[in-house]
């Protein structure tokens, strides 16, 4: 100890990194260094500096245990995504895109991005593309179809702009074994369809999704598009890990997903899909992909996600603040669907227990995400009080600076898969941190406004109740008649073992 006392060196306060939950967790306090030589400090202060600054921090030890638990699950998720492998192409495929695939595109737009997307779909050689729109948009979309490929693109209409009714209308006019739903801005690589069809070689698979990346609207990504790209990169890891761990996925994204036509032709599905109500009162228009995913689980069908460059689609996001309205709509849909999966339908518990765990985690995530800054604020407050009056030894600025450094380091680590391909986006990490806290507050707001079922980002979306009533009354304006669906007998719905 004499050598230590006589030598100019550094001293440090050491605090345990803890947090209740979050991904990855942030600490309450941190290693805080002071570069003052020890020979300039009193003996009393040396003793204080060379021990753990305990004060009342032992009350947070249980939170540290939970934080360790969260780190462990984060590493498990990363490890599972690394060992995940996409299904390879079969030597003798059962399904050929030119014979077995119909692409259904519900839309009310006819912009330049739609034409680019249509060309990318045709590069995969599907048998047919069915565009379903409202009556007022038939002319512009028919012109677009004629300009791209009138032989393989067919335009149908419904009386009101309603995505679920548009999808159902397309299903009724499909004659192939596989349906692929696509957003009007989803741009595919030419290899996407073969890799998606490879999953259907397993007769237990009913739905297939893909990984995704953001396609910038302009020459450079805006901060909103970068935030969306961060979210998609994290999602790609999550869906790859859940697919590898228990074969499940919280949602087959509606941007592009493929299904067996025989499942969607079921009258029970079509009725439930177009008559979906929250709490029996509020009819749902968005959240179609959530409904489809839950239907796969509740009816014993397996799902798979092809996370690979060969099947990775590009999708545009709102390049401005309207991205937040998109996120709000998605968040409401997630609340509704997850609560149904966990507490009403309950098939997810036995079919995909890991996915059920992730859903439970999301229920508590907004609260636990806000615990960190709240506890840091408490420590900062205690640091402004004299020690004799029960305050803490650490200076308040030290706590804030250390917390900021910790958040930046952990969030950057979480985004490394994205930054590996786009290192220039590292400057947006602070924006991602702020967005995380905004998102936590927004999730709580979404929870208390689940009765709001509007689209939020698109004008012209019809009232779902009125649109459904028109469809039920047979008021749809049908396009050219299609031959009846040729039911393939090799498809047999697997038995539902989880009931």
Q: Residue spans of the language-model regions?
A:
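N-terminal membrane-anchoring/stem segments of glycan-assembly enzymes
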Residues: 2-97, 246, 417, 439-443, ...
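Non-transmembrane catalytic domains and loops of membrane-associated enzymes and transporters
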Residues: 93-349, 477-499
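Membrane-interface alpha-helices
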Residues: 447-473
């Amino acid at each position: 100890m004499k050598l230590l006392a006589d030598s100019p060196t550094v001293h440090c306060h050491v605090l345990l990194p803890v947090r209740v939950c979050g991904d990855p967790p942030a600490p309450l306090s941190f290693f805080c260094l002071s570069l003052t030589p020890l020979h300039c400090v009193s003996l009393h202060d040396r003793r204080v500096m060379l021990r753990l600054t305990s004060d009342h921090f032992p009350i947070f030890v249980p939170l540290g245990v939970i934080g360790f638990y969260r780190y462990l699950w984060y590493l498990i998720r990363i490890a599972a995504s690394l060992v995940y492998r996409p299904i390879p192409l079969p030597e003798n495929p059962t399904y050929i895109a030119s014979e077995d695939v119909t692409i259904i595109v519900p839309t009310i737009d006819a912009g330049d991005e739609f034409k680019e997307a249509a060309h990318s779909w045709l590069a995969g050689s599907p048998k047919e593309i069915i565009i379903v729109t409202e009556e007022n948009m038939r002319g512009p979309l028919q012109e677009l179809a004629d300009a791209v490929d009138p032989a393989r693109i067919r335009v149908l209409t419904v009386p009101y702009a309603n995505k679920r009714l548009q999808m159902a209308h397309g299903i009724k006019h499909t004659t192939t074994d596989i349906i692929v739903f696509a957003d009007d801005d989803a741009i595919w690589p030419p290899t996407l369809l073969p890799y998606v069809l490879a999953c259907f070689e397993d007769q237990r698979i009913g739905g297939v999704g893909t990984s995704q990346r953001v396609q910038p609207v302009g020459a450079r990504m805006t901060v909103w598009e970068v935030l969306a790209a961060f979210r998609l990169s994290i999602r790609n890891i999550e869906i790859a890990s859940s697919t590898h761990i228990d074969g499940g996925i919280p949602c087959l994204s509606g941007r592009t997903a493929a299904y067996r036509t025989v499942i969607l032709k079921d009258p029970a599905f079509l009725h439930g899909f177009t008559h979906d109500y929250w709490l029996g009162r509020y009819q749902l228009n968005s959240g179609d992909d959530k409904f489809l995913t839950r239907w796969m689980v509740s009816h014993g069908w397996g799902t798979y996600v092809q996370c690979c460059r060969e099947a990775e689609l590009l999708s545009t996001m709102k390049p401005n603040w309207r991205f937040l309205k998109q996120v709000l709509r998605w968040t409401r849909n997630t609340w509704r669907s997850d609560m149904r999966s966990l507490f009403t339908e309950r098939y997810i518990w036995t079919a995909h227990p890991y996915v059920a765990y992730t859903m439970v985690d999301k229920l508590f995530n907004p609260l636990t995400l806000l615990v960190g800054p709240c506890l840091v604020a408490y420590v900062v407050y205690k640091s402004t009080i004299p020690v004799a009056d029960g305050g803490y030894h650490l200076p308040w600025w030290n706590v804030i600076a250390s917390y900021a450094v910790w958040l930046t380091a952990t969030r950057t680590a979480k985004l490394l898969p994205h930054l590996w391909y786009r290192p220039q986006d590292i400057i947006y990490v602070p924006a991602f941190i702020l967005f995380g806290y905004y998102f936590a507050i927004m999730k709580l707001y979404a929870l208390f406004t689940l009765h709001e079922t509007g689209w939020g980002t698109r004008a012209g979306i019809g009232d779902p109740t009125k649109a459904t009533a028109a469809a039920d009354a047979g008021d749809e304006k049908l396009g050219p008649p299609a031959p009846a669906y040729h039911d393939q007998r090799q498809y047999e719905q697997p038995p539902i073992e989880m009931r």
